[in-house]
């Protein structure tokens, strides 16, 4: 069976850890929709359109991956795209309790939506968008942490 799954996040900015999860999900599932979320409670570094374009560029080598910007409930977005499951990255024990509650909530809201947890490769386990933003704001080199498209976009912001 060829399933559609959704990997959602704000991706502000997209990191190599995100790309690792997307690449691995693309090997496991027929179609991966990267749902780039508009989160009104956050002040993003990049606009929704920019973040969606950066995910698209970073995933151009993956034929079964598409990036779509969205706002609203993820469970509703999943229904609209007939997704069978959500893919979530789990970096460590700090993430597990929150992610399990979120998975249960999305399942309840959608009627039936499973969540598949993928730990990132050991290389990227410590990495987060927040860390990348902090390094960037302090003029640090983020080249090893982000896809090339993101690095170019960050340099254009300087």
From Swiss-Prot:
GO terms for biological process: coenzyme A biosynthetic process. ATP binds at residues 10-11, 18, 89-91, 99, 124-130. It holds the Pfam family CTP_transf_like. The record marks 18 as: Transition state stabilizer. GO terms for cellular component: cytoplasm. Pathway: Cofactor biosynthesis; coenzyme A biosynthesis; CoA from (R)-pantothenate: step 4/5. The keyword ATP-binding applies. It is found in: Cytoplasm. Homohexamer. Reversibly transfers an adenylyl group from ATP to 4'-phosphopantetheine, yielding dephospho-CoA (dPCoA) and pyrophosphate. HAMAP family: PPAT_bact (MF_00151). This is Phosphopantetheine adenylyltransferase. It comes from Actinobacillus pleuropneumoniae serotype 7 (strain AP76).
């Amino acid at each position: 069976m060829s399933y559609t799954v959704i990997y959602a996040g704000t991706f502000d900015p997209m990191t190599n850890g995100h790309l690792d999860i997307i690449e691995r999900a693309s090997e496991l599932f027929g179609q991966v929709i990267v749902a780039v979320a508009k989160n009104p409670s956050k002040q993003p570094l990049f606009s929704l359109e920019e973040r969606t374009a950066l995910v698209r560029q970073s995933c151009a080598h993956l034929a079964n991956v598409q990036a779509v910007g969205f706002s609203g409930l993820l469970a509703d977005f999943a229904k609209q795209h007939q997704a069978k499951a959500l893919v979530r990255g789990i970096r460590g024990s700090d993430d597990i309790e929150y992610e399990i509650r979120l998975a249960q909530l999305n399942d309840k809201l959608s009627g039936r939506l499973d969540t598949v947890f993928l730990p990132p490769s050991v290389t990227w386990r410590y990495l987060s968008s927040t860390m990348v933003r902090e390094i960037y704001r302090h003029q640090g080199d983020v080249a090893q942490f982000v896809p090339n498209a993101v690095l170019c976009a960050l340099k254009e912001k300087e």
